[in-house]
Amino acid sequence: NMVEFLIQEKHYPSALMSNEITVEINQMKKRCDTIVYDVNCQPFVIIEYKAPEVPITQKVFDQIASYNLKLNVPILIVSNGLTHYCCRIDYAQRRYIFFKEIPDYSIFKQYKNEQ
């Protein structure tokens, strides 16, 4: 599963990961699949999972972006188990910068202060 992959292979700290977190957006309760927190317990990465038969489309990115309106994280990850997308948000330039693969957690630390 994706959470185990992130912990075992990409060194995401399990103690800083929470699953199925409720976020209120426009007075509606939504559920983030996984949020990874920084060492100060602030949301840092949002992860959205889809089933393998569900293609990763703009609609999926719109979904995770809506969660980010509330959480304001620098990193977004979307996966259907077969295809993974990971991007950092450049808030100054108002754009997404995609990684070729999901980076090791240690790489993300440099982006925390860019929000």
What are these regions (language model features)?
Residues 1-75, 82-115:
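A short, conserved, highly charged catalytic patch centered on acidic carboxylates
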